[in-house]
């Protein structure tokens, strides 16, 4: 029997049909079209982290592209992990975020900068990353972001998301017209109850729109 609250990880290629269906049930709490969104994310990721209850129900899951990208910027070596679709019902996803970072850090050589990044249009996702990692989370929402974070986000949007900046006035953290899967009305209403100040709101990103914000956390081994 699986211990309630235990974080597990499975390669995407080894997911059973039954487990995928249970992931779909969780995603349906958020999205109007959970099947297409889940299929797209599973094609992009290579690992799924999840917490499964004793009765087999999935309390939360996170699809991850573990070794997403590598590059050298200003003589520093960077490795990127992409945090894809994450949904939670009966379990907090925060411990899963922390487990991904722990596993990722064990693969990094000394001096490597690890970057865990995602794109989002909901303040709850940003808040979850804040709770999981505490510091070195970008964008900060301040008027002036650190130069290194600007360099990293420009690389992420151009090399990974293939959306280069059109002008110097563009916000490098803001991706235009990228999201396909709409939230369901219940989730839109829930997001509307969020009380807090995040860069998502400051950038004018709406949960019922298609713009998203690049969010990332950096750390050095």
Predicted regions mapped to residue ranges:
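A conserved beta-strand-loop-helix scaffold within acyl/acetyltransferase catalytic domains
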Residues: 7-87
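Conserved acetyl-CoA-binding loop-helix of GNAT-fold acetyltransferases
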Residues: 88-106
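Polar/charged side chains located within well-ordered beta-strands of beta-rich proteins
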Residues: 81-83, 101, 217
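Terminal substrate-recognition subdomain of acyl/acetyltransferases
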Residues: 1-15, 39-45, 109-221
């Amino acid at each position: 029997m699986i211990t309630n609250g235990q974080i597990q990880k499975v390669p995407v290629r080894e997911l059973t049909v039954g487990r995928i269906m249970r992931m779909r049930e969780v995603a349906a709490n958020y999205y109007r079209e959970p099947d297409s969104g889940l299929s797209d994310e599973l094609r992009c990721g290579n690992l799924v982290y999840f917490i499964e209850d004793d009765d087999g129900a999935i309390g939360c899951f996170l699809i991850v592209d573990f070794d997403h990208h590598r590059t050298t910027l200003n003589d520093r070596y960077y490795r990127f992990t992409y945090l894809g679709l994450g949904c939670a019902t009966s379990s907090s996803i925060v411990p899963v975020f922390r487990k991904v970072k722990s596993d990722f850090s064990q693969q990094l050589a000394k001096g490597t900068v690890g970057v865990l990044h995602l794109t989002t249009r909901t303040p709850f996702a940003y808040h979850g990353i804040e709770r999981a990692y505490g510091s070195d989370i970008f964008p900060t929402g301040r008027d002036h972001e650190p130069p290194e974070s600007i360099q990293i986000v420009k690389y992420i949007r151009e090399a990974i998301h293939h959306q280069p900046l059109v002008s110097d006035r563009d916000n490098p953290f803001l991706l235009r017209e990228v999201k396909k899967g709409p939230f369901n009305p219940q989730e839109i209403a829930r997001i509307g109850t969020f009380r807090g100040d995040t860069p998502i709101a400051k950038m004018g990103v709406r949960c019922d729109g298609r713009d998203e914000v690049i969010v990332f956390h950096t750390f050095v081994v």
